[in-house]
Design a protein with these regions (language model features):
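Conserved GTP-binding G-domain of TRAFAC-class P-loop NTPases and closely related GTPase folds
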Residues: 2-9, 14-17, 22, 26, ...
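Conserved substrate/cofactor phosphate-moiety recognition/catalytic segment
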Residues: 18-70, 104-111
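Glycine-rich phosphate-binding loop used to anchor ATP phosphates in small-molecule kinases
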Residues: 52-102
């Protein structure tokens, strides 16, 4: 049976992590996001270099899970179609079925992303064909 990848996208505070964690627990699947690789103990630390390394670790973790034949979820901002395609195309090459969900709620973000940055992300956000919008 083909593994499945659920890509959950949205701006900070849209509910990506919350829904991803709930789905992962309910179905017993792995969940990855860049943020989990930016934790230093209990502290979230974001720097450009750390963010780049975290993105690579997240991508590699997702692909390794799919290669092992297991379903998984990845939740990140994925603002552009290109960002979604990186995961979707690589997953499809591994024979995985890919689904994309976009979160559009505004719960407030836990990482204190500045309002100007959030506004820029929202303006730059691109639709993705076939995505489920929640």
């Amino acid at each position: 049976m083909e593994p499945k990848l659920l890509i959950i996208r949205g701006t900070p505070g849209s509910g990506k992590s919350t829904i991803a964690k709930k789905i992962a627990v309910k179905f017993g699947v792995a969940h990855f996001e860049n943020d989990q690789f930016l934790m230093h103990g209990d502290k979230y630390v974001w720097t450009p270099d750390d963010a780049k390394a975290a993105a690579k670790k997240c991508f590699d973790s997702v692909m390794q899970t799919l290669r092992s034949g297991k379903d998984c979820i990845v939740s990140n901002t994925f603002v552009t179609r290109k960002a979604v395609d990186k995961y979707a195309n690589a997953a499809k090459k591994l024979g995985a079925k890919v689904m994309v969900m976009r979160m559009e709620h505004d719960y407030g973000n836990v990482h204190d992303v500045p309002a100007g940055t959030l506004a820029s992300m929202k303006r730059a956000f691109q639709d993705y064909d076939g995505e489920l919008i929640r």
